[in-house]
A protein has these predicted regions:
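Solvent-exposed loop/turn segments at secondary-structure junctions
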Residues: 41-42, 71-73, 83-88, 98, ...
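Bacterial N-terminal signal peptides that target proteins for export
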Residues: 1-11
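Glycine-rich beta-strand-turn "strand-cap" elements at beta-sheet edges
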Residues: 5-6, 17-31, 36, 63-73, ...
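An amphipathic, aromatic/His-enriched active-site/gating alpha helix that lines ligand/cofactor pockets
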Residues: 52-64, 82-116
Length: 122
């Protein structure tokens, strides 16, 4: 097929694709996914601590904060937190209670925490 038939529609699609999304806004909902792997001998205590962290998050402005245990690996958890904006998440991260719980969790880990942040897209 000659280029004259597909070049103009392709160009139009490219313009639409690159102009559809503006820069990320600070007031959009943010999420954090944290993968936590405890030492097998410490998984019960670790589970208590991640549940405390999730409860603390819910009390301090999280839209949602869950701690989910992997079925096949009972020492592996995925924490999912949703915040109204980046400032709310950063405020929670800087709380002394949050820092204390994270320090206690870190002492029980098999591997470092794997934190992934992002912006929710509607």
């Amino acid at each position: 097929m000659p280029a004259k038939y597909w070049l103009l529609p392709l160009f139009a699609l490219a313009v639409l694709a690159f102009s559809a999304h503006g820069p990320a806004r600070a007031d959009t909902q943010q999420f954090a996914v944290i993968y936590v792997e405890f030492l097998p001998a410490k998984q019960d205590r670790g589970e208590e601590l991640v549940e405390q962290l999730a409860a603390l998050g819910r009390r301090n402005g999280a839209v949602s904060f869950t701690a989910n245990e992997e079925i096949q690996r009972p020492n592996f958890f995925v924490l999912l937190a949703i915040w109204n904006n980046a400032a709310a998440r950063q405020t929670f991260d800087s709380l002394p209670q949050t820092q204390a719980l994270l320090a206690r969790i870190t002492a029980l880990l098999e591997a470092p925490l794997d934190l992934r942040l992002g912006t929710l897209i509607e």
